[in-house]
Amino acid sequence: MKRRASITAKHRPAGKRKRPARTTRGISTAEWQARIELAAAYRLTAMMGWSDMLGTHISCRVPGTDDQFLINPYGLLFEEMTASALIKCDTGGRKLSVSPYEVNEAGFTIHSAIHMSRHNAAAVMHCHTQYGVAVATQKQGLLPVTQMALTALNLVRYHDFEGVAHDHDERERLVRDLGNGGMLILRNHGTLTVGATVGEMFARMYRLERACKFQITAMTGGAELNRIPDEIVRHTLTQGQEIYSQGGRGAGGSLMWAALLRKLDRESPGYAR
């Protein structure tokens, strides 16, 4: 069945989005909602200053499938992204939606690897942020020197640089190194987060990027860093797990995500088309 490449949808406020009256054949209500959430993540990434022209990517699994995901068309800026512009593809590399654009090859390698192997990773985000890349180049990686870092470190894993991610055999090593983590520092390259929802994925990237920014800024000052005692490090790591686990007040980033959607509705409302 052929799928048209565009959708007409009237934008609605956050939390009240409905399936548009005219919709692309073959797109379910659940997929359309996923498209809106993912397009929002792209717009917010641009708004945060985390985009790298056309060089990075965010994806989410198509609801109800194990082998299909949505990702950006290679050629659109993040600030231009809309729900209908996103490309649906499968983990075998086939485009399942009509688009004049292709998928970034490195994006396919990275995102297909995680969507194939981590069924609880519905959303995946990869960035080349200023501070994330800076920490990724440092041998010691993310240090336990701030509260933000300590509430994230339980989720952080590392993957060694292998060149531009065009080789599909790197997928196995990416998956191995991510393990059960939620944040991956790609050494000499960038950062990656996964989440059960787009909101959780985005909230994790926010925490990781802030922790990296604080570390680089503190080191730039040249003064000796204040070492946190080991027992306080352990205590704060436990607190971070409790706060961001299911049932914790920061679980899933749901409150942050709802607030960010309201901000996006005010400042860049075209994403839900």
Regions found by a protein language model. Give the residues of each.
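Glycine-rich flexible loops
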Residues: 2-273
